[in-house]
From Swiss-Prot:
Coiled coil: none annotated. It catalyses: a 6-O-methyl-2'-deoxyguanosine in DNA + L-cysteinyl-[protein] = S-methyl-L-cysteinyl-[protein] + a 2'-deoxyguanosine in DNA; a 4-O-methyl-thymidine in DNA + L-cysteinyl-[protein] = a thymidine in DNA + S-methyl-L-cysteinyl-[protein]. This enzyme catalyzes only one turnover and therefore is not strictly catalytic. According to one definition, an enzyme is a biocatalyst that acts repeatedly and over many reaction cycles. It is an enzyme of class 2 (transferase). Belongs to the MGMT family. Its EC number is 2.1.1.63. It comes from the Viruses. Keywords: DNA damage, DNA repair, Methyltransferase, Transferase. This is Probable methylated-DNA--protein-cysteine methyltransferase. The keyword Transcription regulation does not apply. The active site is at residue 118. GO terms for biological process: DNA repair; methylation. It holds the Pfam family DNA_binding_1. The gene is MGMT.
Amino acid sequence: MKIEIIETKIGLVKIIYDDTQTKIISVMFIDSSKIKPVKNSLSGLHKYFKGQNDYFTNLDLELKGTPFQRKVWKQILEIPFGETRTYSDIAMAIGNPKAVRAVANACGANPIAIIVPCHRVVGKNNDGGYEYGLEKKLWLLDFEKKNTQ
């Protein structure tokens, strides 16, 4: 399913498509006061990609996952822009030093990429996977490094 929000002269319209994006499931007007957090997120993403590191403030995230995953993601939110931590660092920080593999799995299940910056979590040799491909992870890390100097 794909959701698209379009700003029109008479208000915001939400369109929901099927998985193949060939059929429209729903079209409806939405109350713009209900999507303020979405606008904050979009503004934050624009700031992020301009290299500003005050990009995500006052966001109310709904982290849907297991209690362990949410604990990992909350810890990852603490990693500063331009820095990295290892999977082991995160496991130790949440009080479960043997859960390195589980931390890696939680990173792979992160539903809020970039905002919950799992790309900042690396293996001991500065490697590790990324749900959206290693090329994107390396680009994000390099981008952040360049914008902290």
